[in-house]
Amino acid sequence: WIMGHMVNAIAQIDEFVNLGANSIETDVSFDSSANPEYTYHGIPCDCGRTCTKWEHFNEFLKGLRKATTPGDSKYHEKLVLVVFDLKTGSLYDNQASDAGKKLAKSLLQNYWNNGNNGGGAYIVLSIPNLAHYKLITGFKEALTSEGHPELMDKVGYDFSGNDDIGDVANAYKKAGVTGHVWQSDGITNCLLRGLDRVRKAVANRDSSNGYINKVYYWTVDKRQSTRDALDAGVDGIMTNYPDVIADVLNESAYKAKFRIASYDDNPWETFKN
């Protein structure tokens, strides 16, 4: 999965997919009542990027729905996964469940079209704080009470705080999550970070009793760091330059071992070769 980083304006969906992304990451900010409000990152952000592009969240979802609904004029067949980077740092811990419920209702209405031929991409809810695990339970409760528990089949999870792997496992236990787990590791492109924790996450993924299904590394903009991440065995790379990642995947060393994921590749299944 080549994951386009910080795609917060509808026009950027086309831009990143056309550069080679088959997945995008979108920031979601919340208002003081825990409603998802804008797709917005703000300052500071990655080096070399404009930090202030934004849409109203529900409007972004409508644009995203068009991009992921077969038959629509804006449809991109290769856009198969969307990571919502949920900026819950503005919320009190006790608002996490409400944020999950409100997020689910927004998605149900504006993305999934109330279960009627809505957008088809897989969705990862990426949460920066382990204490906010109830966002997951709230999300699930809302979809169930709205009569669409089947949509949870399209939803996965990530805790993005670079926490200890054991602590992350514990948070999932509390949330009742037993699958659909993506594990991120990384840092802004302005700084360097080693691959030690990535290797631990990959080892967990590949062990018989691990909780992780997929591992992704962020934010990677250079060819050598792309090669290093691929050598470590990641499933996804988040980047500001999808074309760089695509180029490296075309190198003879990687062409035989990796391919770009399509809609038929289940992002919740651990890859066994």
From Swiss-Prot:
It catalyses: an N-(acyl)-sphingosylphosphocholine = an N-(acyl)-sphingosyl-1,3-cyclic phosphate + choline; an N-(acyl)-sphingosylphosphoethanolamine = an N-(acyl)-sphingosyl-1,3-cyclic phosphate + ethanolamine; a 1-acyl-sn-glycero-3-phosphocholine = a 1-acyl-sn-glycero-2,3-cyclic phosphate + choline; a 1-acyl-sn-glycero-3-phosphoethanolamine = a 1-acyl-sn-glycero-2,3-cyclic phosphate + ethanolamine. Keywords: Cytolysis, Dermonecrotic toxin, Disulfide bond, Glycoprotein, Hemolysis, Lipid degradation, Lipid metabolism, Lyase, Magnesium, Metal-binding, Secreted, Toxin. Glycans are attached at residue 250. One of its GO terms (molecular function) is phosphoric diester hydrolase activity. One of its GO terms (cellular component) is extracellular region. Disulfide bonds join 45-51, 47-190. GO terms for biological process: killing of cells of another organism; lipid catabolic process. Mg(2+) binds at residues 25, 27, 85. Its cofactor is Mg(2+). It comes from the Eukaryota. Its EC number is 4.6.1.-. Binds 1 Mg(2+) ion per subunit. This is Dermonecrotic toxin LapSicTox-alphaIB1b3.
